[in-house]
Amino acid sequence: VEFPNDDAVLSHGFRFRPAWWTSRVPEGWGDFLDQLPAQERRYHRIARADLLTAATDHGLPQALVAGYVWGTGSSAFLVGRRARVFRDNDAQRVDDSLHAVAETLRVGNTVEAYTSMLRGQSQNLKHLGPSFFTKFLYAADAWNGRPGRALILDQFVAAALKSVDGWDISRNGPWDSSTYERWLDHAHSIADVEGVRADAVELAYFTHGRKIASES
């Protein structure tokens, strides 16, 4: 697995159209999307750097939106299904939940924050599973454009953990708290040894896992 440099990590991004999302999220939550770099044909670009600053610059609900936009990219056909989290949860409940989770992160309880968002737990939101709520954790835990302890865990990272490290892990999740804690320990340990950002490890595993998925 080859680890990307800082510039490659921060520029990791996708094209999208703000209009796909602004009509599907609570009023005001998607306004920042029009501020992102514009491209042709009403497209804009969202990069990992934008995700890392979303919570600080715009707010926690906006960080959740940013994670969905970044994680969906140009796949317009997926937007309707993925935006159900905003349609089927009360906006105040979402806001309260995200603030509670962010406070748990702030005091250093990363795994507890993850646990609280799992199905059946206190901060769980309908339709919001680990692949996307770990994007929120990653964004909310960031500081000055760098990750905190929280990292993204999705199907591609899971596939790479199985392939590269031989983990007995389901590709599609959901993943229990002990698996998330193990992933964080593993990624941060590799980052220390290799002298790279922890999210460079996550991106390397994501890239490898996506390659595996495309070949299967």
Where are these regions (language model features)?
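Amphipathic alpha-helical segments within well-ordered protein domains
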Residues: L52-T53, R87, H188
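Structure-specific DNA junction-binding interface
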Residues: V1-R82
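Generic detection of long, well-ordered alpha-helical segments
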Residues: D57-P61, A91, S177-L184
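Short acidic alpha-helix initiation/capping motifs at coil-to-helix transition points
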Residues: Q39-I46, V111-Y114, E181-R182
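Helix-hairpin-helix/helix-loop-helix acidic hairpins
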Residues: T56-G59, A66, G71-L125
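C-terminal accessory module of base-excision DNA glycosylases/AP lyases that mediates lesion recognition
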Residues: V1-W29, T134, D141-S216
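Short, hydrophobic/amphipathic alpha-helical patches that form generic packing surfaces
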Residues: P61-F77, K135-A139, A159, L203-F206
